[in-house]
């Protein structure tokens, strides 16, 4: 049975390629405006909606990632000013990256959430402006990509690095392996 990654994210595609399994991608079509304040429930709901939006037959894997700080979700910034403010808010502080993952195999739906703590170093306005001008913060939750230049913003990480990138591949591998999918 085909494995389908429900995403248009190049980062998630590259991460799943690391597992050396054959898969194809289909972009999910959902509206991401869900009224949910609990970050874990939010990412699990969104990943499930993404998976269920795929009409092709196969084993479907989907994910949704958010940055959570001070009891609020920091999704993808709306513009560069919003990106600047997000990064300024995260300066010298810990935040949590949540990724909800859903795997559908026939009628079986597995949904879980992975959490990783990230601490940013003290970020000057000049460094934030430099980062924003040389990277693409608008397509990333929290306005940064840890796997790219965003690594210069990070002081510490506790948990799964790949979760911060957007796909907790070790846990996904374990589920696929245990179910004899791979």
Swiss-Prot record:
Reaction(s) the record says it catalyses: dTTP + H2O = dTMP + diphosphate + H(+); UTP + H2O = UMP + diphosphate + H(+)
Enzyme class: hydrolase
Active site positions: 64
Location(s), subcellular: Cytoplasm
Domain of life: Bacteria
Cofactors demanded by this protein: a divalent metal cation
Annotated site residue numbers, Important for substrate specificity: 11, 65, 147
A GO CC term attached to the entry: cytoplasm
Database matches in InterPro entries: ITPase-like_fam (IPR029001), Maf-like (IPR003697)
Enzyme Commission number(s) of this protein: 3.6.1.9
Coarse class of the protein's main subcellular location: cytoplasm
GO BP term (any one): nucleotide metabolic process
GO molecular function (one): dTTP diphosphatase activity
Keywords: Cytoplasm, Hydrolase, Nucleotide metabolism
Record-linked HAMAP family: Maf
Chain's role: Nucleoside triphosphate pyrophosphatase that hydrolyzes dTTP and UTP. May have a dual role in cell division arrest and in preventing the incorporation of modified nucleotides into cellular nucleic acids.
Similarity annotation: Belongs to the Maf family. YhdE subfamily.
Protein's name according to its UniProt entry: dTTP/UTP pyrophosphatase
